[in-house]
Amino acid sequence: FIVVPLSINLVKEKSQGTSVRVRVSPTPYYIHILGKTFTYLIICVIQFLLMVAVGIWLFPLMDLPQFDVSGKMFHLLIVTLFAGLAAIGFGVLIGTMSNTQEQSAPFGATSVVVLAAIGGIWVPVFLMPEFMQKIAQFSPMNWGLNAYYDIILRNSGISEIAKELIFLFLFYIAMVTISLLYERKQNSV
């Protein structure tokens, strides 16, 4: 839920001249990106907490079983932080490489839908053809989904989901690094 607004925000900064002021300030550009990361990570956590609240308090009102997070909330928050980082990194990349909101919004939304489909959000990975199952292993959405599954369904701890968390963090680092290199190249001309 964070990729599109973040990428649009970065494009708006370019069109309104804010990014020029950021570049001429004595603060390195990566500090600006870290500030965005922190801000949007808080938004990701708030979104997660709202979804959990719906599962805990609204599900029973609709005759659905209550979402049981007892003893799992800390682990779920850790996954949310890492999944949020991956989404933020992707949003930063799209916002950095886009020149207009008309580019960033549809590309961000479409790419998130495609990554969700590939990652097993729509169709469980085990139901996919074998070649798609192999492709799903490279989707950040699949890493996050598997980490959530492991905690919610298998009562796993952090050590059991460490691989997924590392992949999500490395994805964030890769996206931000590409964004910073692209930004540097664009502004050195």
Regions found by a protein language model. Give the residues of each.
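Long, hydrophobic alpha-helical segments
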Residues: 1-7
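Alpha-helical transmembrane segments and their short interhelical loops
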Residues: 29, 33-106, 113, 159-163, ...
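Membrane-interfacial helix-loop-helix junctions in multi-pass membrane proteins
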Residues: 120-174
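Transmembrane helix-loop junction
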Residues: 12, 56, 60, 95-96, ...
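Helix-loop-helix units of permease transmembrane domains in multi-pass membrane transporters
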Residues: 9-41
